[in-house]
């Protein structure tokens, strides 16, 4: 009987700790790579919506903007872009900032579009090169590209 009692206590303890262990294991580092800009508002907003959803679920999220997507951090674009069924970019962006999401902006793409340091001023963002994108992709568990 003592062995059964110890086994029972062990099982109860394991079942008590299991949800915390499973919950911790289900949290991932997610990288969202965005290449669509204001010319494809639904795709652009969808990328931010997926990032926001992941952050809301407690995942660690990073967003890398490249190509046409670098303009998405311009204040006028943040304030005006809305996707069809994917929400307003400003609302998603504000939620991402509140969740502590870091933004990486392709320095080459920004330079090609005459976007300088003012683009990321007062934003949780930094310019990055392709090498940084590759490093981020290897550091994260999952990568989504829009």
Predicted ranges, named:
Residues 44-82:
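N-terminal, post-signal-peptide region of Sec/Tat-exported proteins
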Residues 125-146:
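C-terminal partner/receptor-binding element of secreted or periplasmic proteins
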Residues 1-11:
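Bacterial N-terminal signal peptides that target proteins for export
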């Amino acid at each position: 009987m003592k062995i059964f009692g110890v086994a029972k206590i062990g099982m109860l303890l394991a079942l008590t700790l299991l949800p915390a262990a499973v919950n911790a294991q289900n949290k991932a580092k997610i990288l969202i790579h965005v290449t669509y800009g204001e010319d494809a508002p639904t795709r652009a907003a969808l990328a931010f919506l997926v990032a926001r959803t992941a952050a809301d679920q407690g995942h660690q999220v990073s967003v890398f903007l490249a190509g046409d997507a670098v303009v998405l951090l311009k204040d006028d674009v943040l304030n005006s872009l809305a996707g069809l069924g994917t929400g307003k970019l400003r609302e998603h962006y504000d939620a991402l900032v509140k969740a502590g999401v870091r933004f990486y902006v392709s320095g080459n793409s920004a330079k090609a579009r005459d976007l300088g340091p003012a683009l990321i001023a007062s934003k949780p963002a930094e310019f990055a090169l392709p090498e940084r994108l590759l490093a981020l992709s290897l550091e994260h568990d999952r990568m989504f590209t829009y």
